[in-house]
Amino acid sequence: MKFRLSLMMFLEYFVPGATVPVLSLYLKNHLHFPAYQVGEILAMPALAGFLAPFFMSHIADRSISSERLLGLCHLLAAGTMIILARQTEFLPFLALFCVYGLLFTPTFGLTNAIALHHVPDARRDFGGIRMWGTAGWVVVAWAFGYFWLRGGLGDDRLPHALYVSAFTSCVLAAYSFTLPRSHVRAVDRSTLMYWNALRVFAQPGLILLCVLTFVNSMVHQFYYFGMSPFLSQLGYRGSYIMPAMSIGQISEVVVLGLLGACLARIGIKRAMIIGAFAQGLRYIAFAVGEPTGLILAAIATHGVCYAFFFTAGYIYIDRHSTPETRAGAQQIFTI
């Protein structure tokens, strides 16, 4: 079962790995949108991601199993992405990207919930499974970002990233329907919507976790969507940007593989403090801006920043969830 969950994670992160590192360049250099429009478009997944988990937290493992819901979300997201790849005007692109965010963003919480449901020991096993998601990101960064983009002229191959993402979503949709269902006991359908999942966060420690995650997530978005134009401004060619950013994902693979042992030794809370501290250090390095070795070293700290804070946070939430509230709690935490 660990292999099947690892493959699910590989495909899940292959999907955004094809688009996120180059999306801002695609909007700016290929579609020639001004900077303020690029910013508005990139904000859409965050807005959609804020709304979608409330709905998903109610139906996941209640009206439909998490595995089936994951497949449905990816199938619809793939269709939306194909349409999106054909858009050249700002308003249609903005609207469709918001729809895509509504469909795709909840899949992060769903894959976490599915993996956490099936593993016997979340603290020991989850990091090793989640590691393969990052491996998927690294593979597409090199296969598409370096080998494919390098063979094109200028930015003419950037639109292909959207089609790669859509195709992988279709593959994952089909694969999701073959996964064993997460069986939970029946719940009272008359229960107030979201109440059981929201009650998970009523504890003071989890409230503090959500506040810290909110702040850290705001900073983290600059890495995902701002690094490609930042590296481009520093003189990196388009075909080298995704491989350069994949250094962070390679370090993430290593840290995730060691996460279980690290959490057993230092605990979740200390790990999250280290992750937040590393986040601050790397942005200081980015602000300095040179030499190249410092920038690449700062990118390499991504593994500690992400795994020690965000992945540890998912495990912490799972510790305080029941099988009935697991999927909903993961969705709400994704906000």
Task: Label the model's feature ranges.
Residues M1-A46, G205-S246:
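Helix-loop boundary and gating motifs at the non-cytosolic
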Residues F10, T80-L84, F90-L110, I114, ...:
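Hydrophobic core of transmembrane alpha-helices in multi-pass small-molecule transporters
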Residues L23, T105-P120, F308-T322:
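Intracellular juxtamembrane helix-capping segments at the cytosolic ends
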Residues L51-S65, W148-G152, V254-I268:
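Helix-to-loop junctions at the C-terminal end of transmembrane segments
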Residues L51-T88:
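Conserved MFS/SLC helix-loop-helix module at the cytosolic interface between two early adjacent transmembrane helices
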Residues R68-I82, R270-A285:
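Structural signature of the two symmetry-related core transmembrane helices
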Residues F144-W148, A161, A166-R185:
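C-terminal membrane-cytosol helix-exit motif in multi-pass small-molecule transporters
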Residues L179-L212:
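Juxtamembrane intracellular "pre-TM" segments in multi-pass secondary transporters
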